[in-house]
Amino acid sequence: MKTLRFPAGLYGITPEWDDTDRLLAAVRAAAAGGMTALQLRRKLADERLRAAQARALAPLCRELGVVFLVNDHWKLALDVGADGAHLGRDDADPATVRAQAGAGLLLGVSCYNDLRRADALLAAGADYVAFGTVFASPTKPEAVHAPLQTLTEARARVLACPAPRPAVVAIGGITPANVSQVAQAGADSAAVISGLFEAPDIQAAARACAAAFSVNP
């Protein structure tokens, strides 16, 4: 299998927690369970808190060996030394970000259920393409649905890319109970928010999610 630009496995997405100490402890627990990447996603926080949490998470993720990305705010990602940024449809243009940030910044992109969007963003150099929601999501209850077949079709596209190839990420309503479905459908990684960080045992939830990818490489 071609080497991936973005790590396979469990991709944690931060919940809307203002308590930074609680967040850092949860990230440690998730990493202990096998989380390979983390995205700071703070849609409701003010700029100061978002930046403070990014500055706290960047060195922690380096210590833990977890790839760290910032949602939307790619300049903040650069400022704190994050590994990458995640961009949605309404965020900065990925090609523009790539031109300004250089090849060293990982860029992940939301593709919803749109394979043609994925084709264009893969051509622009995206390091992963994310599809969802694959299951009903408590975080985005009104989001578009991306069926599991979308992951299978996306995988065929990324396998045609030169090595190291981009990854396929699934998001939306993923829990330890259903994560194996996205792995079997072709996702390299599962992005999980409440199914991880709202679990009664975060480390155990992380371990269960990570295991789905160890048996479905």
From Swiss-Prot:
Tree of life domain: Bacteria
GO molecular function: magnesium ion binding; thiamine-phosphate diphosphorylase activity
Catalytic activity from the UniProt record: 2-[(2R,5Z)-2-carboxy-4-methylthiazol-5(2H)-ylidene]ethyl phosphate + 4-amino-2-methyl-5-(diphosphooxymethyl)pyrimidine + 2 H(+) = thiamine phosphate + CO2 + diphosphate; 2-(2-carboxy-4-methylthiazol-5-yl)ethyl phosphate + 4-amino-2-methyl-5-(diphosphooxymethyl)pyrimidine + 2 H(+) = thiamine phosphate + CO2 + diphosphate; 4-methyl-5-(2-phosphooxyethyl)-thiazole + 4-amino-2-methyl-5-(diphosphooxymethyl)pyrimidine + H(+) = thiamine phosphate + diphosphate
SUPFAM superfamilies: Thiamin phosphate synthase (SSF51391)
Protein name (record): Thiamine-phosphate synthase
Sites where the protein binds Mg(2+): D72, D91
InterPro entries according to UniProt: Aldolase_TIM, ThiamineP_synth_sf, ThiamineP_synth_TenI, TMP_synthase
EC number: 2.5.1.3
Pfam families hit by this protein: TMP-TENI (PF02581)
